[in-house]
């Protein structure tokens, strides 16, 4: 009997669990159906198929901006390569090797190809790698990139903002020029790229690739990529999620880093003029893929992936900076219990926190003020006691000096009185002495006269 009751209860529990599970599945299915939009067929033409054309026309009217950061040692060919990439002489003056610090020089140009306008900003690292102490050579570059992110963030946070007219100066790509001399990456190169890989899209290029043979160049490429991977440096990978360009981008990812040669000089090869470098042993054609990877770089950088570089800068690198800055300011997407927070809730919580912090600071300042006042009062009282003691001492000394002077005065007056008495006595005596000789003379004269008679 007991076993039958147990089986009955177990069966009821199983039925209840199964029913609850089925109800949960039905509820989830209904929720998904509720959340997903319904697909409908229109009975006629509406016109929103022209949205892509509208977007293209608006973009062409607005124009585009593209910002390139060139990092590399002085004289490695940064300016020449940029001139060659855009087929323009940007008139950048040669830099000296004797700058005490690394500084960044940004120059903006307006370019137009057909009806497309491009605002191109080229940022050059002047004096990079020229100092004896290269420990902090990468810091000005990091500071510059962060400064551009901060400027864009401040524009975004304005109450009255105008991002449509704002000149976006955020760096979209960093062309990192690697010297072809040596057998591996320099420590400065590793430190710099490691510091920049989370802030900018890095495309490493081997500059002046005509300085080494093809065999050495291939070994050098393999060595560089191995060092980048082993040191955790994240370079820009051409995207493969778009089917139209996935195949060529995947192929080009295998050619990194690009070995490039730049030149604006034209040399006659056969029956045509080509951009090339003329050497005693022959000609290195810039746009010949058998000679260097310049064409690959131009195709990947400008023709195929320029918009992806701009998008990666905004959606990845800038978002990382923005999230970090907002978290430092106290803004969070979720609360303590992983509940979503609105901006108003975050603001109110932060305002309450700041209010409490202000109250605490005010209380601390009051206590500190009272403590300082007490300390000052104690110091003043001690100084007052010292002054009072000094005053009493001086008063006592003055009194003693006064008594001593009065005693001297009394003695002096007594001496004066005694002297006066002596003087008076002396004068009397002198007068008596002066009068006595006269009377005797008269007596003698009278006596003589009597005798004569």
Curated annotation (Swiss-Prot):
Residue ranges, annotated region (G3 motif): 124-127
Key word Cell cycle present: yes
Region G4 motif, residue ranges: 207-210
Keyword Cell division among UniProt keywords: yes
Domain Septin-type G span(s) in chain numbering: 62-328
CDD domains: CDC_Septin
Biological process terms in GO annotation: cytoskeleton-dependent cytokinesis; protein localization
Subcellular localization, as worded in the UniProt entry: Cytoplasm; Cytoplasm, Cytoskeleton; Cell projection, Cilium, Flagellum
GO molecular function term, any single one: GTP binding
Annotated Gene Ontology cellular component terms: cell division site; microtubule cytoskeleton; motile cilium; septin complex; septin ring
Region annotation (G1 motif) ranges: 72-79
Binding site for GTP: 72-79, 127, 208-216, 262, 277
Biased composition (Basic and acidic residues): 27-37, 441-453
UniProt-annotated stretches for the region Disordered: 18-43, 433-453
UniProt modification remark: Proteolytically cleaved in vitro in a calmodulin-dependent manner.
Keywords from the UniProt entry: Cell cycle, Cell division, Cell projection, Cilium, Cytoplasm, Cytoskeleton, Flagellum, GTP-binding, Nucleotide-binding
Function: Filament-forming cytoskeletal GTPase. May play a role in cytokinesis (Potential).
The protein's assembly and partners: Septins polymerize into heterooligomeric protein complexes that form filaments, and can associate with cellular membranes, actin filaments and microtubules. GTPase activity is required for filament formation. Interacts with ADGB.
UniProt similarity note: Belongs to the TRAFAC class TrmE-Era-EngA-EngB-Septin-like GTPase superfamily. Septin GTPase family.
Record's protein name: Septin-10
């Amino acid at each position: 009997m007991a076993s039958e009751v147990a089986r009955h209860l177990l069966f009821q529990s199983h039925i209840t669990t199964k029913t609850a599970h089925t109800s949960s599945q039905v509820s989830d299915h209904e929720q998904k159906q509720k959340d997903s939009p319904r697909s409908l067929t229109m009975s006629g033409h509406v016109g929103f198929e022209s949205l892509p054309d509208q977007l293209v026309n608006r973009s062409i009217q607005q124009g585009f901006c593209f910002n390139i950061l060139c990092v590399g040692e002085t004289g490695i060919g940064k300016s020449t390569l940029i001139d060659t990439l855009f087929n323009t002489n940007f008139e950048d003056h040669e830099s000296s090797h004797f700058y005490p610090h690394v500084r960044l020089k940004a120059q903006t140009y307006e370019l137009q190809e057909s009806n497309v306008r491009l605002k191109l900003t080229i940022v050059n690292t002047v004096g990079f790698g020229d100092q004896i102490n290269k420990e902090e050579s990468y810091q000005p570059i990091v500071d510059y990139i962060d400064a551009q992110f901060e400027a864009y963030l401040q524009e975004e946070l304005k109450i009255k903002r105008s991002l449509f007219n704002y000149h976006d100066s955020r760096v979209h790509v960093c062309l990192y020029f690697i010297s072809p001399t040596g057998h591996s990456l320099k420590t400065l190169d590793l430190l710099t790229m490691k510091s920049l890989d989370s802030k900018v899209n890095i495309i490493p290029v081997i500059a002046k690739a005509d300085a080494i043979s093809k065999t050495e160049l291939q070994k050098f490429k393999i060595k560089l990529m191995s060092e980048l991977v082993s040191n955790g440096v994240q370079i820009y990978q051409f995207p493969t999620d778009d089917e139209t360009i996935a195949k060529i981008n995947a192929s080009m990812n295998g050619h990194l880093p690009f070995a490039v040669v730049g030149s604006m000089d034209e040399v006659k090869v056969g029956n045509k003029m080509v951009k090339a470098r003329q050497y005693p042993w022959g000609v290195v054609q810039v746009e010949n893929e058998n000679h260097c990877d310049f064409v690959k770089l131009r195709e990947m950088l400008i023709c195929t992936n320029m918009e992806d570089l701009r998008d990666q800068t905004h959606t990845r690198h800038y978002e990382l900076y923005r999230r970090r800055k907002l978290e430092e300011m106290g803004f969070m997407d979720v609360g303590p219990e992983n509940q979503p927070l609105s901006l108003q809730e975050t603001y109110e919580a932060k305002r309450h926190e700041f209010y409490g912090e202000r109250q605490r600071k005010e209380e601390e300042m009051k206590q500190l003020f009272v403590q300082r006042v007490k300390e000052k009062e104690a110091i003043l009282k001690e100084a007052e006691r010292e002054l009072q003691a000094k005053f009493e001492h001086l008063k006592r000394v003055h009194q003693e000096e006064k008594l001593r002077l009065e005693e001297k005065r009394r003695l002096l007056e007594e001496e004066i009185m005694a002297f006066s008495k002596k003087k008076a006595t002396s004068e009397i005596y002198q007068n008596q002495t002066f009068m006595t000789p006269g009377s005797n003379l008269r007596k003698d004269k009278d006596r003589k006269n009597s005798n004569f008679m």
